[in-house]
Each structure stands twice: as structure tokens, then as C-alpha cells.
Amino acid sequence: MIAQPPIQFDRTTGVLQGANPWERLAAVALLAGSKVSSLFSHRGYNACANLLRKTLSEREIAVRLNDDAVFVFPYGDGYWSKLLNRSFKYEDELELLFQDSAGIDYTLLDCGANYGYWSVLVSSRPFGAHKAIAIEPSSVNYARLANNARANGGRFQAMHCAIGAARGTARLSGTKHEAFSIAGGAGAGGEVVPVIALDDLIDDGIVAEGGKYLVKLDVEGVEIEAIKGGTRLLRGDTVIMCEEHGSDPHHTVSRYILEQTPLKLIVYDPASDRFETLTELSLLDRIKVASHVGYNVFGTASAFWEDRFHRMNANAARRVH
């Protein structure tokens, strides 16, 4: 049986093409569900969308993110179908940094890339056409990541491995494609995957020591191990972007960055529309309002990137006045 071509959706115009009547009705439901559930941080949306997906034929959707970026995923996917809602912004605080950095010569290290959303976007012309290296441990996710690299002209590199403290292997476990993890240890079962450290990328000649890097660490519970494995990379002109879990009242990742590394800890505060440099963690108690959501925090030892955050704050102040 020949696979059907992907449904096409343009986030700029809202035009949906190539869908049959039932798929169009499903799109209406997915859009409405996103708008309603956005009022409570999309709680329950993924599960409801995945139930709806069971009624659909297996098919992909190609979402045009901008005039130079196409992101392909299974139609009805609970995690990514929020993109059908044109007002939805995925990890808005990361997009602010990437947009502001369009004119800077940096490389994105997209660790835990999933299907490659950020690599697709950052390598596109409106975001500066940057070099991106997308790193994903799951073989199932990696196949979709590689497909997105091909769909965008092969302009970013995809690597099939996990990020940890040192080179080796680990077992990848989990039931949700957006939450596979090597944190369970050798007894967790699941797929055996290669592991590399961030500094191995320097040793292997994949990245150069002394460049500018934005490092997204979406590594599901091994953020601290990943930071430990990137000592050389992180002491240069690098920013790490880590997920601070809403369900963690101790702010474990942020606490480690603040107390155990030379990095400055920075967080985006939606209330002030500013990136705040933290010397203690009480602000996170206010920002982390939903236990099922991840909140990105930033760490850097770079005066260059610190200045960029200050510039973004100045630009935000000008927008208000």
C-alpha cells in the first residue's frame, strides 16, 4: 500500500490542504481543544488528542512554521497537534532567545531533539539559517528526526545517541515519545542506546572549542549529568537551556546550576517580560504554576551571552513604552 502524502498546514495563513472530511473535522477538534485547554496550561490535551488519533488513518501532517521551515509529525499526535492552533507558542522563552540571536554566528546543539522542531526552526532563514546538530536517543524518534532533516533539504545534522556525563551506553525507557529517558538506569528495560558527553562533541571534531553555542538540554531527568559532561563547552560562549520540571518543588536542576557550577542562572519571568538573573530560587516558586509543565532555565558563564539577555530586556522595555 502506497503511503498517502502528508496533510499540509500553514501556520501563517491557517490553510489546511490535502485532508479528507473526517481529517478536517479532527483538525477543528484539535484546534478547539488547544484553545480551551490553554486556559489551564493544556492539561489533558495530549491524552484527548491521542484518543482522537486512534480514529484516524495513519498519516503525517507537514506544518509550515515559516516560509523556510516544514515540521512533519503523525497527524493527531497529542504533543505536537497544538501547532494547529496558530496562537500557540511552543516554549516561548526559547523562541525569544532564538529570534534575538538570528544575526549571531552560533550553533544549536539540540539535545533530546525529539522530531527536531527547534533544529528545523533555528536552521531556517527567518531565524538566521544557523548550523544545528540534533541529538536524539530513541530510534523511533530518530527516524522522524531524520525525516524532518530531509524535508528541510538536509540542512541540519541528526545524531542517534543520548547525552550524559560520559561516553558509554544506557537503556532508554518510557511510553511517550516526548518523555523517553535514560534516567531509569540499567534495570529499566527498553532500548540500549549509545551515550556521549557534550565535551565528546569537541573531542570527536563535531564542534570546535571556542565557538558560540546554544545548547538545549531536553534530556528528561539527566540534565545534571549532561551538565557534568560539558565542562569545557560550558566555560566558553555557551548558553544551556534546561527544563525545570513543574512537579519539582526543590528546583533541583536550577539549584545545581546556581550552587554547583560557575554558570549564571537566568529565567524568563512572564509577569515582567524580562530575563532575570537569579541569586536565589524563590522566583521559581511563582513562575512554576503548573505541575505537568516544564519551565526552561538558562545557564551561562559567557559575558557575551549575558549582554544579549540584557539587550533583550532593554528591547522589551522599549516595546512597553
Give each language-model segment a name.
Residues M1-S139, A143-R155, D203-G210, P270-E276, ...:
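S-adenosyl-L-methionine
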Residues S139-Y142, A146-H177:
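Core alpha/beta nucleotide-donor-binding catalytic domains of modification enzymes
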Residues A113-Y115, S139, I163-A165, V219-G221, ...:
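Short, glycine/acidic-enriched loop or turn micro-motifs at the edges of active sites
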Residues G128-H130, G236-T238, T261-L263:
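A short helix->loop->beta-strand "cap" motif at the edges of active sites that frequently abuts
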Residues R86-L109, Q157-A158, R167-R171, H177-G236, ...:
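Short internal loop-to-helix segment that lines adenine-nucleotide cofactor pockets
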Residues M159-C161, P262-D273:
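Conserved S-adenosyl-L-methionine
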Residues L109, I135, C161, V215-L217, ...:
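Active-site flanking residues adjacent to catalytic metal/cofactor-binding acidic residues
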